């Protein structure tokens, strides 16, 4: 009511500089002169449109959000959360496809990470997924990202071919040719291998020599060959920030067979699949390629006394996708490179993409970082020297014999917490009966609102005719034609209706979101980050706007006859 007069007074001043038809300019002037009077008609229009928007959206919004919220939480039809700290073993995963009516599944590792290297930085949720499998069975809404889930998750991988560095079965020792720039006590050279049995082991090559470039040799008798080389490490006992900085030269890796013959596996100067391991000081290891090998400038930081390089395709960090809250709260951008802290390990990361929302996020934290499951577990296993398994599985289930399928899944995973769409829907307040009830309430409220609006519009029109009778007579006496008079009325009413529709739609959407948010928050589990959608009742909205327009046209017809009548009456009175 306070803003409306100001708007039309400004509009009246603006049109003073523009040459407009008399009916248009006078209509705007009339509203600016009597803005508080016309505000009542405007309030009727705003109330009708906003009220219709709000009440017609309740049952529709409840229904669609109830269904989508369950899908957001389960990702697919069924989601299993393993309670065992050892995760879901490979043999347990193989059992899944033996369960009848299970079409497909995908594994997930959910964990916690923090910014920086102290472990006390800003916390966020880590979701390690299978980029190729998850999009085939997961639910994903169009407004969750600028692209489809499949396109978004492709940013976790790059089309590169990494050649594994393999030690075959006919070797018993391994050698690294290296040299330290100076004498460093209690500093050992290690090589990390993944054996044919899947175990990750460290082979020590002894104290690092500083006198000259020499071979550092380790025994492979306890390694299941063939084995893959994962990393070259330097170990120095001590706390994480007290390691001795020095420069290490690495020339080549050789395998030694049972006849003590050496076979060169790689020359460090020609092999480009190496990157520094982050430490407690971040990315403080600098790697420089020279003509015969590589030089490592090792800083004071370490991971439990370990520094060095690891074999990888991703020299700038493990690709990650983050949500918009992560970017905002941590002041990061796409392609930023930094170190995070996960399970006691410092992990190098590069942000390759972003997503607005992702199913099942916000279970533990508001911020989210998504990894390729294989890539992040490879690095964590390398540093922890133990197998990292997924702790969740999402399953796509055929609807035939659904209940029996759930029982079969539960019997195979007795310790896992199971979330399925059917059970969550049954727990929800958004039942079919509740939807029907709200639909009935909305229908009754709509027709009551419609009746009140039409009565209010009719009442205002009658009162307005009497209130403006003298002004209309003056216009007639001044020679204003019937067409011009109708133009004045048309401008008045159409301006009021246009502004009212705009304000009514905006206020209706706002009020509808608040109302539906209150209803959804009463449900069995409120996910504050789940983006509710407002489903507009277009039929009711179009219907009430159409009836207002019909009433407007009818009002113009009545006013036309009324103006003709009062002019005739005034003419006869003047003649008498």
Which positions does each model-derived feature cover?
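Juxtamembrane segments of multi-pass membrane proteins
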Residues: 5-155
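Short helix-to-coil transition segments within interhelical loops
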Residues: 31-32, 476-483, 575-576
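Small-residue transmembrane helix packing/gating motifs
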Residues: 73-74, 224-233, 300-321, 355-399, ...
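A short beta-strand structural signal in non-transmembrane regions
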Residues: 77-83, 177, 321, 327, ...
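Peri-transmembrane interface segments
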Residues: 350, 408-452, 464-467, 488
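Short helix-loop junctions at transmembrane helix boundaries
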Residues: 502-546, 556-570
């Amino acid at each position: 009511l306070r803003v409306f007069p100001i708007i039309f007074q400004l509009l009246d001043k603006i049109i003073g500089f523009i040459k407009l038809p008399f009916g248009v300019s006078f209509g705007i002037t009339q509203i600016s002169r009597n803005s508080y009077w016309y505000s009542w008609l405007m309030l009727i229009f705003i109330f009708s449109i906003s009220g219709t928007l709000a009440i017609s959206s309740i049952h529709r919004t409840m229904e669609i959000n109830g269904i989508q919220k369950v899908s957001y939480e389960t990702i697919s039809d069924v989601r299993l959360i393993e309670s065992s700290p050892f995760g879901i073993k490979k043999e347990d995963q193989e059992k899944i496809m033996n369960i009848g009516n299970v079409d497909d599944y995908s594994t997930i590792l959910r964990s916690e990470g923090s910014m920086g290297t102290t472990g006390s930085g800003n916390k966020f949720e880590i979701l390690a997924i299978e980029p190729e499998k998850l999009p085939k069975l997961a639910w994903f809404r169009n407004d969750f990202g600028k692209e489809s889930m499949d396109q978004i998750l492709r940013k976790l991988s790059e089309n590169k071919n990494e050649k594994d560095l393999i030690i075959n079965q006919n070797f018993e020792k391994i050698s690294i040719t290296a040299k330290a720039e100076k004498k460093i006590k209690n500093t050992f050279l290690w090589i990390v291998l993944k054996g044919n049995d899947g175990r990750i082991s460290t082979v020590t090559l002894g104290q690092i020599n500083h006198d000259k470039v020499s071979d550092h040799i380790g025994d492979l008798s306890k390694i299941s060959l063939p084995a893959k080389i994962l990393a070259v490490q330097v170990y120095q006992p001590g706390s994480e920030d007290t390691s001795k900085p020095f420069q290490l030269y690495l020339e080549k890796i050789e395998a030694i067979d049972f006849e003590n013959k050496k076979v060169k596996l790689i020359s460090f100067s020609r092999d480009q699949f190496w990157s520094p391991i982050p430490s407690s000081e971040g990315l403080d290891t600098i790697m420089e390629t020279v003509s015969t090998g590589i030089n490592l400038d090792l800083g004071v930081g370490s991971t439990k006394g370990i520094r060095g390089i690891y074999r990888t395709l991703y020299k700038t960090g493990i690709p990650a996708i983050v949500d918009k809250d992560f970017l905002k709260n941590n002041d990061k951008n796409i392609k930023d490179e930094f170190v995070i802290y996960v399970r006691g390990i410092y992990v190098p990361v590069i942000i390759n993409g972003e997503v607005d929302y992702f199913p099942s996020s916000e279970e533990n934290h508001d911020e989210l970082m998504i990894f390729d499951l294989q890539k992040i577990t490879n690095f964590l296993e390398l540093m922890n020297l133990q197998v990292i398994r997924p702790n969740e599985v999402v399953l796509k289930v055929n609807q035939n014999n659904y209940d029996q399928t759930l029982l079969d899944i539960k019997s195979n995973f007795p310790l896992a917490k199971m979330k399925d769409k059917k059970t969550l829907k049954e727990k929800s307040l958004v039942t079919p009966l509740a939807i029907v009830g709200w639909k009935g309430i909305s229908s009754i409220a709509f027709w009551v609102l419609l009746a009140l609006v039409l009565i209010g519009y009719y009442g205002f029109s009658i009162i307005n005719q009497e209130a403006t009778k003298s002004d209309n007579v003056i216009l007639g006496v001044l020679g204003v034609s019937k067409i011009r008079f109708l133009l004045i009325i048309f401008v008045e009413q159409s301006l009021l209706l246009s502004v009212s529709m705009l304000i009514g739609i905006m206020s209706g959407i706002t009020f509808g979101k608040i109302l539906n948010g209150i209803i959804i928050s009463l449900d069995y589990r409120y996910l504050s980050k789940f983006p509710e959608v407002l489903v507009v009742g277009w039929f009711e909205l179009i219907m009430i706007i159409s009836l207002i327009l019909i009433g407007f046209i009818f009002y113009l017809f009545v006013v036309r006859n009324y103006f003709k009548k009062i002019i005739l009456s005034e003419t006869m009175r003047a003649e008498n």
